[in-house]
Every structure is written in structure tokens, then in C-alpha cells.
Amino acid sequence: MLTQGVKLFKGYRRGQGFIFREDDPRFQGFQDSFQERFEEMLSDPELRMINRNRGSGTRVLIDGLLGKHQPQGFLYEAKSHQAVAAAVAQSRADWGVAIRSVAEDQGLGFTPLQDEEYDFIIPESRLQKPAVQALIGLLDEKPIIERLEQMGLIRNLGKDR
């Protein structure tokens, strides 16, 4: 629930997921039975993960997935989704968590885990300022939407409040 005096403008969302090399036989059929296979994977000492840096939203997601498990590679942290995808593509790691667009850019397999939403909360007292009006207008401009879609962001069409 929002506090009084602010307004929510829905922004964009992007899908985060489990990434892996599609030609790695250890991940065959992985997308069909993720939960079951993920448990098996955590007990395989041969599989190396690449983690995200502490404090990132992706790290929060990973820590929630892993619980108390610390698989091989847990201590190796990457600072971006691109770095995670590069590590997996170059076989420095077998799996990680990243956004769909970077997995596709590297030709990696992707199993969706959850969407992240990016919204804007603006004080009502600033709604009429030219910069705020410009931002609100940009949210629905077709060229902006198309460019952001190329980067893996989808316009969040939920209700503004």
C-alpha cells in the first residue's frame, strides 16, 4: 500500500531465470521438471554455479532458491547479468541466474524463475513538473518501448495508482 501523497506509475518488468549451456547433457529436460531436477543438481559436486554479488536483487532470489545449500562456485560472484552469462557460455561455470535477454544473446538455455518489476513512485506535489511529465510521457512512447524490449524489458501494463 502506498503512503498518502504519492502516485504509482507502472514501469517495466523483466524475466529472471536459471541459465545453462543447452548442449550440456546434464541439463537435458531440465525445463520440464525444474524443481525436481534443481534438487538433484544441488547435490552434484561436479556442477559449478556462478553467483551474483551480495546486495543485488538477483542474489536475493538465488539465496532464496538455495536455502542453506552452497554448491560448487557459490563464492564466485559476478557483478552483472552479462558476466554471469559469459561465465556460463565460456564454461567457467555450468549454471547461474540472469535475465532472459543476456541468456539469449549468449545462446544459452533459460528456465524462467520470476519477473522483476520496475515502477515509479512520484510525490503528487511534483506531478506537474516538466521533467516528471516528460518521464511519464516516455513510458508509453513506442520507440522507447521497442528499445527496452530489445533489452529484455516489457512494459508493465498494470493499473497506475
Positions of PLM-derived features:
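A ligand-binding cleft/hinge motif common to bilobed small-molecule-binding domains
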Residues: M1, A85-Q114
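Periplasmic-binding protein-like
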Residues: Y12-G15, Q106-G137, L139-D160
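Short coil/turn segments
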Residues: R21-R26, I50-T58, S125-L127
